[in-house]
Swiss-Prot record:
Coiled-coil parts of chain: none
Gene Ontology MF terms in the entry: metal ion binding; UDP-3-O-acyl-N-acetylglucosamine deacetylase activity
Protein name (Swiss-Prot/TrEMBL): UDP-3-O-acyl-N-acetylglucosamine deacetylase
HAMAP family: LpxC (MF_00388)
Protein family according to the UniProt entry: Belongs to the LpxC family.
Gene (name only): lpxC
Catalytic activity: a UDP-3-O-[(3R)-3-hydroxyacyl]-N-acetyl-alpha-D-glucosamine + H2O = a UDP-3-O-[(3R)-3-hydroxyacyl]-alpha-D-glucosamine + acetate
Keyword Lipid biosynthesis: yes
Organism expressing this protein natively: Bordetella pertussis (strain Tohama I / ATCC BAA-589 / NCTC 13251)
Top-rank lineage group of the source organism: Bacteria
Alphabetized Gene3D superfamilies for the sequence: lpxc deacetylase, domain 1 (3.30.230.20), lpxc deacetylase, domain 2 (3.30.1700.10)
Amino acid sequence: MFRQRSIQNLVRTIGVGVHSGRRVELTLRPAEANTGIVFHRVDLPQVVDLPASAIGVGDTRMASVLQQGNVRVSTVEHLMSALAGLGIDNLHVDLTAEEVPIMDGSAATFVYLLRSAGIVEQNAPKRFIRVLKPIEVREGEGRNEKWARLEPHEGFALAFSIDFRHPAIDSTANFAEIDFATHSYVREIARARTFGFVNEVEALRSMGLARGGSLDNAIVMDEFRVLNSDGLRYDDEFVKHKILDAIGDLYLLGKPLVARYVAYKSGHALNNQLARALLEQQDAWELVTYESQAEAPQAFRHEWKLA
């Protein structure tokens, strides 16, 4: 059967929260089959557990934030994206502050940590959410219109369009499509960094956001150009980072999707609305397992081969 996965060994790192600016220690621990991804705020007098869940998202301003009462775990999307990309179903995530560290602004460090810990298969079938009919969410009109859609597809593919009307972004691709039957998450998506604009920093920081942002963990632009001395990692890094985010946001559904995701100018809020809309329309999806890897769509066999 196509099996669930966790990691073999504990692994930890230290970083800074991109929004809080606070130092945080991140520990990734193996978890039993059928546990799911569970975040633990170990810095509190009594540890609070926050399972990764689309319905557990309480804030989507510039990040996906899990919330349980007054307890938060912010900026989970890059780690969730790496877990989706490597096919990891079960994991304990210990944090000593309210935000997952930003590392270099991409998912690459998390991929490295997870691979370093060793990926192991477990004696339980991996369950997938197969989309049976299109689900779409929209907001705004005219120039402000944005939308996201899930549609049936035997595999996992994403197509994303952006429109920032900024010279540094417009000089790169504003559209990318990735089908994991033929593309690699690790090589083509994981290294794409988050990005921001110098002229927005002051306003964001006044809202308690972007306090840990820097050229070390984001692509930063002024009115005309990219300020990072090393330039871009991919010619289409901006739109690929939006795909990276979407993969992480959708993995908050708790299981890998058998579907195609198509979006125009979507972000964390719309991605979460889409995930919730899918869960609410129960005739639009089904849970499936595969008796063997050969039965599963190529998209999952291609990327998830154990080293």
